[in-house]
Amino acid sequence: NTNKKLIMKGDYDYLKLLNISCVRIMKYDYLIVGSGLFGAIFAYEANKKGKKVLVVDKRPNVGGNIYTENIDGINVHKYGAHIFHTSNKEIWDYINQFAEFNRYTNAPVARYKNELYNMPFNMNTFNKLWGVVTPEEAKQKIEKEKNEAGIKEPKNLEEQAISLVGKTIYEKLVKGYTEKQWGKRATELPSFIIKRLPVRFIYDNNYFNDIYQGIPIGGYTQIIEKMLDGIEVRLSCDYFENKEELENIAEKIIFTGPIDKYYGYKFGELEYRSLRFETEELDVENYQGNAVVNYTEYEVPYTRIIEHKHFEYGPSLGKIAGGKTAQKTIITKEYPDKWIQGKEPYYTMNDEKNTSLYSKYKELADKDSKVIFGGRLGQYKYFDMDKVIIEALKCVKEELK
């Protein structure tokens, strides 16, 4: 590989020496950095149109953050819970080419001390909190608490949340969770973080309002593998460590990593929040009875526990020889973490300061004809999976028209 690297570099230097500037040795049309959803879709579509593509990923596996690993018959979401949902039929049909989806519906449960509440806030939640039975009673209760607080112009997140849902819901279900998520007290957080809190006056625990929802039977990794079938992929290959070879290997780069890192943090670091996961296999058949349980009190250090087997149900799940159910389950505790270089960036911090910093990088990128940035980190924006697909297809259309 080193020889190959030297020969290529040697050829390039030799041509420069002969001053044959019109000849460029380009082995690929596109180098795609990152094999997550954005990178894989671009690779798949470009390959279909006859383009020569190389995908590199610093991880030892494809899939980016939607990577799932089968452990003892259970598909484990390695980088946090991923539930696909969309109201866009075109996008739903697109993703269904690559896997069959089950009818999983996201209905998380929030645990505050030993009390359990349905999320998002709905009539089941209000009945458990106050014993109210009708939507009218629930509305009156919330309005009464909002009026008692008397907050006209919220100065921070705490005041904003209380002005939206009252003190009881805030204290039990919002405060601790949010403080853990952001690593700051709610009184120190800006009010704009919570623009609204979804409140439903119906008995419905479905978290999303979208028409289509589910999880691919057999996990997400197969989707990416099918997209990248027949395409050259190099794993455990860090773009920055192999930059000299990689940056002159293709006509154009599709970069799905952090835009600030690509430009050497020229204007300074963008801020992110990171996560830390602790996964364990337990000798019980069913640990918590739900895929996702949020822990809303501040004293519990993790924000949620995921029990992976509940994302997919059915005869094949966790079965062992003889058709018996495996007396095992796999859980993951999710801890929010301060991001520093070297840690995985999961959430972008789209406040005023970071938005303005990103616009400087975006300006640089717009003038750079060699590279296109895509995905959460490339575009410095929180995208749900369906929005990533929309962005990737839009990018392909623009690029290959």
Locations of regions flagged by a protein language model:
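Extreme N-terminal leader/targeting segments of oxidoreductases
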Residues: 4-30, 48-49
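N-terminal Rossmann-like FAD-binding beta1-loop-alpha1 element of flavoenzymes
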Residues: 30-55
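Glycine-rich FAD pyrophosphate-binding loop
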Residues: 47-71
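Mid-domain catalytic core of redox enzymes
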Residues: 12, 49, 239-364
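Dinucleotide-binding Rossmann-like beta1-alpha1 core, especially the glycine-rich loop
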Residues: 72-147
